């Protein structure tokens, strides 16, 4: 077997930047200065520009006139739009999977759920490694639920939506602790409770059981409810300006 061809410099820059945008190491709204990126990733100007242009096409990066690039912001409006898109794309995929899935699909769903259930995480006190693991297992569970669907285009759209939602999920996980650290403790417990509820294994177990029971109506209702959890976390985490980050942090104070 031949070894895989090494990544080009542009591909390497793209995947490194993409990873750090999705896990919010590069924070939503943050300026992406080429000099800082070059030092951080050891990649030259041209590969960085090409990688950033590619990420802009995926709406993970925004181009700012005469100012370069920035990480795409996280917002309630964007989240609501993503949720609508997820409803349109993911529900038909789930229902098709339930109708067409056989023993291999059932086994994949059960295995993915078991692995997610073994991923113990405290949402407001998770390390980056713990959050990465939960993200991976959570995405794998939802991918398993949809894996018997046959529409390659819908699955591609679902992957794009999932990546964008991952950024929102990760930033939402940071928001309550950030606000508390900035002295804004009002609403902290409510926000953390909503975050824990959204990540609870019980919701995922109910979704798995409905799918395996071929209960279309229950699966549809549970997935619709599940998709709405992220918005509830946002609503309970935002400040009076509708922002997740305290004003003093947004200003760099």
Question: For each predicted feature, which ranges?
Answer:
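Short linear motifs at protein or domain termini
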Residues: 1-99, 236-244, 248-253
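Short, structured helix-loop boundary elements
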Residues: 7-10, 106-109, 131, 155, ...
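A short secondary-structure junction motif
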Residues: 20, 24, 116-119, 123, ...
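All-alpha effector-binding/dimerization core of bacterial HTH-type transcriptional repressors
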Residues: 73-149, 195, 199-212
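Short amphipathic alpha-helical segments with heptad-repeat character
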Residues: 80-83, 155, 220, 224
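Hydrophobic, amphipathic alpha-helical faces that serve as interaction scaffolds
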Residues: 85-101, 139-190
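Short acidic/histidine-centered micro-motifs embedded in hydrophobic/aromatic stretches
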Residues: 111-112, 160-164, 222-226
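C-terminal all-alpha effector/ligand-binding and dimerization domain
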Residues: 171-253
